[in-house]
Structure formats: structure tokens, C-alpha cells
Amino acid sequence: MSEKTFLVEIGTEELPPKALRSLAESFAANFTAELDNAGLAHGTVQWFAAPRRLALKVANLAEAQPDREIEKRGPAIAQAFDAEGKPSKAAEGWARGCGITVDQAERLTTDKGEWLLYRAHVKGESTEALLPNMVATSLAKLPIPKLMRWGASDVHFVRPVHTVTLLLGDKVIPATILGIQSDRVIRGHRFMGEPEFTIDNADQYPEILRERGKVIADYEERKAKIKADAEEAARKIGGNADLSESLLEEVASLVEWPVVLTAKFEEKFLAVPSEALVYTMKGDQKYFPVYANDGKLLPNFIFVANIESKDPQQIISGNEKVVRPRLADAEFFFNTDRKKRLEDNLPRLQTVLFQQQLGTLRDKTDRIQALAGWIAEQIGADVNHATRAGLLSKCDLMTNMVFEFTDTQGVMGMHYARHDGEAEDVAVALNEQYQPRFAGDDLPSNPVACALAIADKMDTLAGIFGIGQHPKGDKDPFALRRAALGVLRIIVEKNLNLDLQTLTEEAVRLYGDKLTNANVVDDVIDFMLGRFRAWYQDEGYTVDTIQAVLARRPTRPADFDARMKAVSHFRTLDAAAALAAANKRVSNILAKSDEVLSDRVNASTLKEPEEIKLAMQVVVLRDKLEPYFAEGRYQDALVELAELREPVDAFFDKVMVMVDDKELRINRLTMLEKLRELFLRVADISLLQ
């Protein structure tokens, strides 16, 4: 069977840049699934994406499905005919479904009986006939949150469609996709190359588009070119470009023919905190800032044009004129804000609602101030500095700079606090209170910042859970999942001596009578422990290891982490599987017993050598391991407990627990309970698989 290259290109108006990659990847994944479901043999499915097009190129696509033999077994002969030999309704219905009569059916005989059988040779459909529907289905399944409709048609897509190119080798596949008749016409760059041309063969793509249309259709190629050219441009002016992945992706999605240029701005603007300048350059203008080798911002920026100009200086000057007013605004806001102290903004916080039932930002500030001081006392941080940081924590939200450039919240608080002469750890805490903002983000760097960051997040968690508005499904408007994980990360990775129980109780207490959920403390703790499950799974821990620790509901995050590491290490020991099974057996025995057990094992009633030996070792280990548990040395404790494998195995091999002698039975059950309690001091290892 011959093979050909298949090309589909959907020519559109400018696609959403932040969604371009996901649209192209989904298109490729959907179409690959369609090919596989249809049984069409194919080679690589390569996707292309540019601002005004989505395309797929499939190598070595078979020209038709393979022929196949099908068999459909019908009713057993006994049910297929009545006593007179006439076909039953079941047999007739089955035959109709196969497109035959009962008389035309074959018989299938096996050692289990005889059935009606339909056999047929099905000729594979041509690829040409299948492709239009496969393309349409793949496009319909794209993850588009909001569809557009254009003109008088009822067609919906992410953006208006102008061309549809469907080529199998050199042949146009006739189809109407998204309201457009397929053709071999491709549109080039808006201002360079040929605005429109025809493609003779699918193999010519994407080279023909580059040569005649001045469009680089390969997304990764455009991105790599921008990155390399920007790095070279920065090197020429003695700096390093800030090529964040997200901005690099967005810019690559905005241009069809990237041309990297370098521009500058007035050095006087460098007196403004660099974060504000960078915010407007990256966020508003999609420029790449440039830093010197010492990390200081240079008065230059790199941008990407979508055209090769005969006079690039004109484009450079135009971009410099565009960015100057934005930088001047930042300078004005910075100078204006510094005319008063940061704490002078406190009264204005009373005018901004945090949440209708939970009060204003000033109310939140008062709670954060108290909670940050309490946390600082628990972790040995400077209480006065923590309460001061709590008082100032939201003041920068009322400044002109943050009002205009919202992403500078926190960092501007730090700069204004420094200007006011606040302690350095207070200023830094104002910047770091929102950390970690995302997975892998840096944690607060000093104890005061840790106290403030935890206080801010715990106040939100306690408040929102306290009024019954916990996250549901994908909806999490107050980012409670991120807040919970942030608190856990700070406590665990900074090894802070904090207990979620007392921490949550204190956060709830500070709300007074505003909260309506009587179970708020337990709800918050359960929610946070649930975040542990996701965290440790991402870290590579097995689900049963996590469940074994969660079963004990340890509320000290640092302690939880120590238990996780201990159980994970325990699983590598030779004795682990046997002891996990033994714990499960003990758990089942105790669960089925309704006996009232003793507080301690009565050694004088023990008879068998195996139970005497096990009882002695349990007593010895109980005393020996008490300091281990007190110090959180769970790994060492489980290593010691692993030595119980042989006596436990011997006990179950030789000793009957549920004997008729009640005193002996209770004594043996008590010993097993004491054995299990030792393991439960770390985790419920009976849950290990």
C-alpha cells in the first residue's frame, strides 16, 4: 500500500498568543487519535503554529485502511430456534443487525457449544474519504473556552477562518471545514513576501511558506531564533537578557517573522525600583529587560519586530517613544508615594473590603499583625519586627504605584519601608509575604518574613473556611490550595516548630464571632493534610506511604515530613513486607475482638517460648524507643522495629491467639495491641501494599 504526506493548514485571523501552543498540541493529539482509531498507518505527526495559522503535517500516511475480517457471534443454537426449528426473535434481531438473514449465518462449534456466526470481509475505506471528518472532529475538540462567530454564518471557532488547505500528496482533499471550502491556497505574511500563493505538494510545507510567504511556521524554530538573537543582542551591549520562558513563549506566538532589535530608555528612570520598570516592559510591552553582570538593570531593552524593515531605527525609535510615558508614570508614582510614610496608608485600608463577611483589609491587617507576632514567638523570630511587618503588610496596596502596576505589590512595600527607615527584615518581609507564589517558587528568606507569610495565608484559610466557602471542584477564587501548600512548604522546608492544630486555632480565635462554621479548625487541618497528599505524590512517594502517615493525622508539618521519610526508608528494608502484613493481621484480629484488654501484658500467664520472647522484645523496645519518638527520630525507630520480624513470624507460626482460656486470650491480644502501638507511633504500616 502506497504512502503519502498529508497537510492540513487552517488560516485564521490572529490567534490568542497565550493559547497558541496548547491549540496546536491539542490539534496534533486529537488528529493522531483519529488516525489511530481509524486504523490508518502513519509516520510522525508534526504540528506548526504561527499567529495566523494552525497546521499539521503527517508523514507516510497510508492511502486506505487495511481490509479486515470481522466475526460477530450470535445466540446459541438452543436459543436461536424454537422446537419447530423456526428462528427466534433473538436470532432474527441479531441477523438484522448484521445485515443478513438467519439462513445466511454460519455455525460456530466449540467444546462449549454451538452458536450462530456472521463472518465478513470488510474493505478498508480510502484515506481521502476519511480525512475531512477527522480534521473537523479534531478541530471541534480543541480546548477553546470562548468561541467566536463571524459574518452571517453559524460557524464557531477561536478566531475567524479564511483558508483551509488539505493536501494528500499533491491532491486537494475536497471538504468544507469551518465554513471554508478546502483548497491549495496559503496566505503569507501581511507585509512581506507573497500575500497569497498555491502549494503543489504537501511535502513543500513549511519551506514554501518561509520562502514565498516570509512566515516561519515552526513554533519551536521561531522561539529558538528569538532566544538566540536576543542573547546575542544583549551580549553586544554587555548585558544579559531576561528571557523568561512565559514571555518567550508569548512573543514567539505574536510574530511570524521575528526580527530582534535593541532599544534604550533614559538613565534617569533607573532611580525607580527596577521591578516597576520591568513590570511595564514585560507585562505591557512584551519587551525583554537587560541586566548587567552584577544584576543591575541596564537602560536598554530588547524587543521583537514582526517585519524586516529597510529602516529598523524607525521601529526602534517608535518603541522607545511608546515605553517612555509608561516609565515616566512609574517615576511619578514612585516620587509621589514617597511623600508620605507607608503606615499613613493604614486608614485607607478601612475603605477596602477583604470579604463581605470577614471585614475590610484593615481588619485583616489587625489579625495578621497579631498572628504574625504569635507565630514569631513560636519559631524564635523577632516578635516586634513580625508585628510591625504585619501592621504594614497591606499598606502598599493603597499606593499609586501598586494601583497602576498591580504585580508590584509586596516589592513596592519593601522599597517604601526602606525609604521610611524600617528594619531590613521588616522591609524584606513585606516583599516575601506572598511567597511561595507558585510551585517551585522561593520561600521567605528570614524568620520574620516566614512569620508574616504564614500569618497572611492562615488568616485567609481560617476566614474563608470559617464562612463555609471552601474550594469546590476547579473553583478556588481565594487560592486556598496555593495558600495551604505555601504554609506547609515554609514550615517543612524551614523546619519550623509549628503545629497546625494550635496555629489554626489561633487564626480562628482572632476572627472573634465572625465565623459561622463550627468545624472550621478541623476543616482547615483536613484540607491542609490533603495538600500533603498531592505534594508528596509529586515528590515521587507512593500513595500507600502517604496514606500510612495520614492515618496517624500528624499535625506538625515538619513531623509529618520526618514520618514520610522514615516510612519510605522502612520500605527498603528486607523485613518491611512481612511486618506490614503482620500489622495488617494484628489490626484485623484486634478489630474483630470485643474483649476489654489490659493496660499491660501479664508475663506470668504467658506459656509458649515464642510469645514470651516477643513480649520481652516489645517491652524492651517500648522503653528504648521512647526517646526516639520524642525527638522525631522515626527512621531510627523503624529500623529498630524491623528487628521484630523473626519473633513476630515465629509467634504467628506457633501461637494461637484466640484460645478458649479467656485470661490467656486477653493477655495475647494485649501483647499484640502493644506491638501495634509501637508501629503506630510512626505510621499505620498495615496500609503498605
Curated annotation (Swiss-Prot):
Catalytic reaction equation(s): tRNA(Gly) + glycine + ATP = glycyl-tRNA(Gly) + AMP + diphosphate
Gene Ontology annotations of biological process type: arginyl-tRNA aminoacylation; glycyl-tRNA aminoacylation
Catalytic class of the enzyme: ligase
Keyword Protein biosynthesis among UniProt keywords: yes
GO molecular-function term, one example from the UniProt record: glycine-tRNA ligase activity
Chief localization: cytoplasm
Keywords noted in UniProt: Aminoacyl-tRNA synthetase, ATP-binding, Cytoplasm, Ligase, Nucleotide-binding, Protein biosynthesis
GO cellular component: cytosol
Domain of life: Bacteria
PROSITE patterns according to UniProt: AA_TRNA_LIGASE_II_GLYAB
E.C. number: 6.1.1.14
Compartments where located: Cytoplasm
Subunit: Tetramer of two alpha and two beta subunits.
Family: Belongs to the class-II aminoacyl-tRNA synthetase family.
NCBIfam families, A to Z: glyS
Protein name, UniProt field: Glycine--tRNA ligase beta subunit
Origin species: Escherichia fergusonii (strain ATCC 35469 / DSM 13698 / CCUG 18766 / IAM 14443 / JCM 21226 / LMG 7866 / NBRC 102419 / NCTC 12128 / CDC 0568-73)
Lineage of origin: Bacteria, Pseudomonadati, Pseudomonadota, Gammaproteobacteria, Enterobacterales
